[in-house]
Amino acid sequence: RRQRQMCIRDRAVADYRPLHVADEKVKKQDGNMSIELERTDDILKTLGERKNGQFICGFSMETENMLENSRKKLEKKNCDMIVANNLKQDGAGFGGNTNIVTLITKDDEVQLEKMTKDEVAEKIFDFILSR
């Protein structure tokens, strides 16, 4: 039986965070307020750069050009697989117990039907272990 190290990054980490954080409540003033944002560290990209034989699986949440954007992410972040979610599909993404995903590797695209998130997790593991 073959052993494999893998990393599955399934958190929707924010791409940006506030540059300045107030220590106390910000009082209402006349006019509008702007909040300056800074980019957060790209955890998945860092893992891909440091990869040493591990299988790296990331997630992609898209509202347009899902397959194209997810393939770019696969390559740019040096992942072995991206689990792509189209947030515009009914029953997919956040806020429910179901999801509809496409498993994307360099050579494959496997569209999974709508199923529970637990079932999706099992399919992801089965797919990875079959590699």
Question: Which residues does each PLM region occupy?
Answer:
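Short, conserved loop/helix-junction motifs that constitute active-site signature segments
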Residues: 48-52, 76
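Conserved positions within well-ordered secondary-structure segments
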Residues: 24-27, 83-89
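Short, small-residue-biased leader/transition segments that mark boundaries at the very start
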Residues: 1-7
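Anionic-ligand binding region
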Residues: 16-49, 68
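Small-residue (G/A/S/T)-rich helix-start motifs and N-terminal tracts that mark the onset
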Residues: 5, 79, 86, 91-131
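Short glycine-rich anion-binding loops that position phosphate/pyrophosphate groups of nucleotides
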Residues: 11-19, 61-64, 87-90
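Short beta-strand/loop segments at the ligand-binding rim of alpha/beta enzyme cores
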Residues: 52-58
